[in-house]
């Protein structure tokens, strides 16, 4: 009986399952055929729901100078509009409005009057009124002009110092989709790093509204903001270079000019001013997209004698006291090499030949070396190839020489082409005991969290000359300045080499006009402890040697004054380079004892027992006398006496402490708001310092 009952129950269950199955099939068939559930049309319902994906834009990183002064940032931009025939307040006095806006928008009064006279509801005051900054907007708002209003645009890039270092910084433009794209200079080279990575958020919404459907999932990926880039440029020195180039352009009508200052020991580019330049806030001012520092190739002239003479010394082919007959030299093929002083200076020594820039002396030495040897030295110095500096469109020049005549002219910088950045790299051999150092322009890259992701540092390219060779070159480079009063600088010991190169004619041969030359100068100072290399070149300056030299020496004097580089303060230890270790988590007393012999200026912050932070970090280099900041695990911190500190040093001090900082002026600290020795309240205090230039 039990077995029969079980069978009946099983059949009943199977029947129920089958009925449910057919019921579900029937329901699904109904839904498919009718597109309805409980009277709701599914197609209409689905059509009313949409997946929205919104871009979360990353903030573009800023660009700073080496001392933390902002050079490029991202700001809101606006378009100036004028209501003419609207139901709002219209422009009441068109002539007065045009006259007031003309200087601010850099548009003619006539053009503005033309726009304001249109028979329209409103007009945009383009081009000058398009994409203006908040600073310009505020200037216009102060005028309280009736009928003038603003439309907010996409964000744009703003360059605080206009034409300042324009080819180095470059520019970025806002595209139609709102993205800011780097186009030139650092903005272009590091576009990806500055841009960061956009994020997004995805969610469901009804098409009838802009709101997210409640209780539905949202997929979000945060934007990763772009990193900030700190250049090696010192704004104070850059301003000096800019002033010098401006003089070359406007006083001497120079076709183009470049004035670059490089740290003699590390290769950091401290300043580089050029003509032409442009205002990156107005891309209409760009007439030339090539940077004269890295993209212009030219015959350098007699500055190349630094390297042909040094190569002869290195190869044992040079005796400075040996004499030769100056004036002219005839090569085997009949080519006559002449000195700039056609009659020559009589029979003179090779040392004097360098000081007087004798082409005959350079040719004689080059013939002793031969094509292969001189070519090898030029190649080892970095000519004929890119230096690899962090800028696009770097040219390589041409140092090819085959024949005796090409060897001769290459020894004094004719028949070969170089770039200014190559000259600076090669000159670094004269300040690093014969070792060539790679130039660089990025000091560090800092991500959105404040982490240093890249630290620029000294990079060795190749050892080319011995210490003995460099010492001899210093001796004869000093003579160049000693025998020529135009290159002497008060209170600054300077050595260098001048250059005057003929300019190749498109028709063959060379141009022959009065000013058809490229003038150049390579300077190193101070002579005993080189801190800076200055390289200057200009095409067709309409000036005398004295006027040309005065612009350069004035700039050198100002740079030396700013950097506190006088003969009385020179110290051989300043040239010593120290590579730092990691001192974090070490015992303070032990570490200070270890560092004593390195002659570093150590700023110990707090009286704790252990070191919890340092700057610069491990593997960074310092020169003897430069500051190393060490933060200890103290319970309280007292204010340092900051008098005489650079703003970069003050920023480092405040950053490592977490102390808020405000400053004004340029140069070195003159006064500070928190007295030295005062206990710091890091949460509530703000340090204010006033800077001034040294005299």
Predicted regions mapped to residue ranges:
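Beta-lactam-recognizing serine transpeptidase/beta-lactamase-like catalytic domain environment
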Residues: 70-72, 207-220, 259-301, 307-538
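Ligand-recognition elements built from short beta-strands and adjacent flexible loops
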Residues: 536-551, 555-695
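Second-shell loop/turn segments in exported
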Residues: 49-52, 80-90, 98-101, 121-129, ...
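Sec-exported extracytoplasmic/periplasmic mature domains
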Residues: 102-106, 145, 173, 195, ...
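Periplasmic/cell-envelope proteins involved in peptidoglycan metabolism and beta-lactam response
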Residues: 1-281, 372-380, 489, 545-562, ...
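Extracytoplasmic
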Residues: 56-59, 66, 75-77, 145, ...
């Amino acid at each position: 009986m039990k077995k029969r009952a079980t069978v009946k129950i099983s059949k009943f269950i199977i029947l129920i399952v089958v009925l449910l199955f057919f019921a579900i099939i029937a329901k699904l068939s109904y839904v498919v055929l009718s597109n309805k559930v409980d009277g709701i049309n599914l197609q209409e319902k689905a059509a009313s729901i949409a997946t929205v994906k919104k871009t979360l834009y990353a903030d573009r990183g800023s660009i700073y100078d080496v001392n933390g002064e902002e050079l490029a940032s991202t700001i809101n931009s606006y378009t100036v509009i004028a209501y003419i025939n609207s139901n709002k307040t219209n422009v009441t006095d068109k002539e007065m409005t045009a006259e007031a806006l003309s200087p601010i928008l850099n548009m003619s009064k006539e053009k503005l009057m033309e726009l304001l006279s249109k028979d329209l509801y409103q007009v945009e005051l383009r081009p000058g009124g398009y994409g203006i900054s908040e600073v310009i907007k505020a200037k216009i708002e102060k005028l309280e002009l009736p009928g003038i209003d603003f439309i907010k645009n996409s964000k744009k890039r703003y360059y605080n110092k206009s034409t300042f270092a324009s080819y180095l910084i470059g520019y970025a433009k806002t595209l139609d989709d709102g993205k800011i794209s780097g186009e030139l200079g650092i903005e272009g080279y590091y576009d990806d790093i500055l841009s960061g990575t956009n994020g997004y958020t995805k969610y469901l919404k009804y098409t009838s509204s802009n709101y997210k459907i409640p209780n539905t999932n949202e997929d979000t990926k945060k934007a990763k903001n772009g990193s900030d880039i700190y250049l090696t440029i010192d704004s104070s020195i850059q301003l000096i270079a800019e002033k010098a180039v401006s003089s070359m352009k406007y006083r001497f009508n120079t076709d183009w000019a470049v004035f670059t200052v490089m740290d003699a020991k590390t290769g950091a580019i401290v300043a580089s001013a050029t003509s032409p330049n442009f205002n990156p806030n107005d891309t209409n001012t760009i007439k030339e997209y090539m940077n004269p520092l890295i993209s212009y190739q030219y015959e350098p002239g007699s500055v190349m004698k630094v390297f042909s003479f040094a190569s002869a010394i290195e190869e044992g082919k040079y005796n400075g006291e040996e004499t030769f007959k100056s004036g002219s030299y005839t090569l085997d093929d009949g080519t006559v090499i002449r000195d700039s002083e056609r009659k020559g200076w009589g029979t003179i020594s090779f040392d004097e030949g360098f000081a007087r820039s004798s082409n005959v002396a350079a040719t004689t030495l080059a013939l002793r070396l031969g094509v292969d040897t001189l070519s090898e030295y030029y190649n080892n110095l970095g000519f004929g190839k890119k230096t690899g500096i962090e800028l696009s469109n770097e040219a390589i020049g041409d140092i090819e020489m085959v024949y005796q005549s090409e060897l001769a002219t290459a020894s004094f910088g004719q028949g070969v082409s170089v770039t200014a950045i190559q000259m600076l790299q090669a000159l670094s051999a004269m300040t690093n005991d014969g070792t060539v150092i790679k130039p660089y322009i990025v000091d560090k890259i800092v991500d959105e969290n404040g982490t240093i992701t890249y630290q620029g540092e000294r990079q060795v390219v190749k050892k080319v000359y011995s210490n003995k060779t460099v010492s001899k070159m210093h001796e004869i480079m000093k003579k160049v300045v000693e025998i020529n009063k135009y290159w002497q600088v008060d209170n600054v010991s300077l050595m260098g080499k001048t250059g005057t190169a003929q300019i190749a004619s498109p028709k063959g041969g060379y141009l022959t006009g009065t000013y058809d030359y490229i003038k150049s100068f390579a300077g190193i100072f101070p002579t005993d402890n080189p801190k800076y290399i200055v390289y200057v070149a200009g095409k067709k300056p309409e000036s005398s040697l004295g006027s040309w030299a005065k612009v350069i020496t004035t700039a050198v004097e100002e740079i030396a004054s700013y950097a506190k580089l006088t003969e009385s303060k020179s110290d051989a230890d300043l040239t010593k380079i120290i590579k730092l270790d990691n001192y974090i988590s070490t015992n303070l007393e032990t570490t200070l004892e270890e560092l004593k012999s390195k002659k570093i200026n150590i700023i110990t912050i707090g009286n704790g027992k252990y070191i919890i932070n340092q700057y610069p970090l491990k593997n960074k280099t310092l020169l003897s006398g430069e500051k190393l900041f060490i933060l200890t695990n103290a319970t309280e911190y007292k204010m340092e006496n900051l008098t005489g500190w650079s703003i970069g040093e003050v920023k480092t001090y405040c950053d490592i402490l977490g102390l808020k900082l405000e400053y004004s002026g340029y140069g070195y600290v003159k006064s500070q708001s928190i007295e030295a020795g005062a206990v710091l309240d890091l949460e509530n205090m703000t340090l204010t310092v006033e800077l001034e230039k040294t005299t």
